[in-house]
Design a protein with these regions (language model features):
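Short, small-residue-biased leader/transition segments that mark boundaries at the very start
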Residues: 1-6
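Glycine/charge-rich, flexible interdomain linkers and switch-proximal surface loops
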Residues: 7-15
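Class I S-adenosyl-L-methionine
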Residues: 14-56
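A short, flexible beta-alpha/helix-coil linker loop
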Residues: 29-30, 175-179
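Conserved S-adenosyl-L-methionine
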Residues: 45, 49-162, 178
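Conserved Class I SAM-dependent methyltransferase catalytic core
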Residues: 122-124, 128, 132-136, 162, ...
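Hydrophobic beta-strand segment of the Class I
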Residues: 170-171
Length: 221
């Protein structure tokens, strides 16, 4: 497959054996780039992965949402948008189809400004991180997304949690890979399990990880 651009029109060409498929790209920049992210921490969570993870939990805003290792705030922002039923691409600056000859700007503006599908969010999203720099970045992204009213942030290590808002769900993406040693990683998950057992009673917890031994350290199964 290949891609070419002719006067702002992106054409995808895919050749397989004797078949050739031509398609016009109506999106432009990848749709996983929502448009609200103005800065990011090291190894930020992909926006689509964050949204998919939240949707997998079944949560749609019927309780508080907590991310105690929030980094640049992606899970918090996607959670608030899901709770409010805000269209995920609403913050994008442009789409490729806006440069098409038959682009209907009036129709696009009418659809873009239609908020009839949005809903109230009676609870709140709470985020924290051990890093002041991460919280500063998350704050900028949340402000860019226009969600300051729905998300609370603070600099706070997970192990310092002594209470949790009720009712609630916890969804988080702990540090991994080169950012943390194997020994510290297992210690981190042991601490996560301890906090879940003593502070987040009654919660459902969804944690993104890549090692089964990490979940073993949580010790809830």
């Amino acid at each position: 497959g290949s891609e070419m651009c002719i006067r702002d029109r992106y054409i995808n060409i895919h050749i397989s054996h004797n078949d050739c498929t031509l398609s016009i790209d109506s999106s432009g920049e990848s749709l996983h780039k929502r448009g609200y992210r103005v800065d990011q921490t090291e190894a930020p969570l992909n926006e689509v992965l964050a949204a998919g993870m939240i949707l997998k939990t079944g949560w749609k805003g019927e309780s508080n949402f907590v991310d105690p290792m929030c980094g640049s705030g992606t899970l918090l922002i996607e959670a608030a948008m899901i709770a409010l039923n805000i269209a995920p691409g609403i913050h994008r600056k442009e789409f490729a189809f806006q440069k098409w000859v038959d682009y209907d700007e009036e129709l696009f503006d009418r659809i873009y400004d239609d908020e009839s599908g949005e809903r109230e969010f009676a609870f709140h999203c709470y985020g924290s991180d051990i890093s002041q720099a991460a919280i500063d970045i998350a704050l900028e992204n949340i402000r860019s997304a226009g969600l300051m009213k729905y998300i609370d942030l603070k600099v706070k290590p997970f192990q310092q949690y002594t209470e949790a808002p009720k009712p609630g769900i916890l969804v988080t993406n702990p540090p991994y890979g080169e950012r943390i040693s194997s020994r510290d990683l297992l210690g981190l998950y042991n601490m996560i399990g301890e906090r879940l057992k003593h502070v987040f009673m009654g919660y459902k917890a969804w944690i993104l990880s890549y090692k089964d031994e990490c979940f073993d350290k949580i010790g809830l199964c």
